[in-house]
Amino acid sequence: MARYPKRQKVKRYRRSFYTREMRLKKGIGIAVLVVAVLAAAWVAAPHVLDWATHTWYTVVRDRDLSASSAVSESASSGAQSTAASEPAASSVPEKEPEPEVKGTDIVTGLWAEVDVTTLTDEAAIRSAARQLKAQGMTYAILTLKDTAGQVYYASQTAVGAANAAPTQVELTSVASIFKEEGLVPVAALTAFRDPAGARADHALAIRYRGQEYLWLDNKASAGGNPWLNPYAAETVQYIGDLIAEVHAAGFDQVLLENVRFPSSTSAKQDYGTTNGVDRAGQLTADIAAWQARFGDTVTLWYGYSLAEVTGSSSQLGAPAAQLGVKNLLVKVPSSSTLDAAARGELTLSLTEAGVEHLVIRDDAASYFE
């Protein structure tokens, strides 16, 4: 039997039939797969690390990272916001704060008087204040003790309480509301022309020489009235106590009027012990005593007539500017007026005499500033 030679088997591999195009596609697929794996690892890595860290500390180390993580994140975000805001803040220059205006500060502005008897409640007080502000006013004068000696608030002094006016105002409300509306409230107090106070306490009054009777500035039948005695320490104390009361209620500025003697001089007048001090000297001492008592806590104004300012009078014994007055309110009589030039001359002369602040009231010219 004839034998045929054994045929050699041929092994065939699939790669033997790969074309170039197939190899290219395979390479691209592998590259895409690698990129996908790397991307997935990149995304998952933080979470895996957080999980691993949390597991390590909570399971292995028995610790809780939630609180510390929150604090860390808060600190980090705070630092980032601070760093972000610093360039903006540094690029804008800081505006210097304006100095605060105190109640005792004297500012330029218009003045007006307020009828205290109309300030019956909070609504009336606020309405009056807003009307003045709408008219451009800065200062509001409220007479709290008049020339009759009546006091328009609940004074705690014995003499003031004995001479309470029929209308009483709530000082704290008046002062606070006027300030809220942008006004400077000024308490006006009549000083030595005070018949009610003299009758309530004879120790404060001028008497007839050698008698216990109160001296009157005219015949009783003609309506004569007693006056407070500028030489009496009790009188100076009483006026000072009234200043203290209105200041405690919120009035930082006070206008004192009738800081003077009666116009008449008579040998029948008994002022007690004068130690040889004349009228001008005693008024200067009284003004200095109030200034020493209140210092910078209260701004004290003094009101005088034009005649008392420009010349000497029996009431003062010297021009008002020579009494140590720093803040002066001058009243021009209604029968005359001052033009701008005359006001300038008056201001200059009083400034040279030592007056620091001057307000002129000229009703005929509708000028009060």
Q: What annotation goes with each model-predicted range?
A:
Residues 1-27:
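N-terminal Lys/Arg-rich, disordered targeting/topogenic segments
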Residues 28-46:
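Hydrophobic membrane-insertion alpha-helices, especially the h-region
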Residues 45-53, 320-369:
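Substrate-binding cleft of secreted/luminal carbohydrate-active enzymes
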Residues 50-107:
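N-terminal, intrinsically disordered, polar/charged segments of Gram-positive cell-envelope systems
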Residues 93, 146-190, 259, 264-298:
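Aromatic-lined substrate-binding rim segments of carbohydrate-active enzymes
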Residues 102-113, 117, 192-244:
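Active-site-adjacent "subsite" loops/lids of carbohydrate-active enzymes
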Residues 123-151, 245-257, 320-330:
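Catalytic domains of carbohydrate-active enzymes, especially glycoside hydrolases
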Residues 186-193, 254-258, 277-315, 354-364:
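Aromatic-lined carbohydrate-recognition surfaces of secreted/lumenal glycan-active proteins
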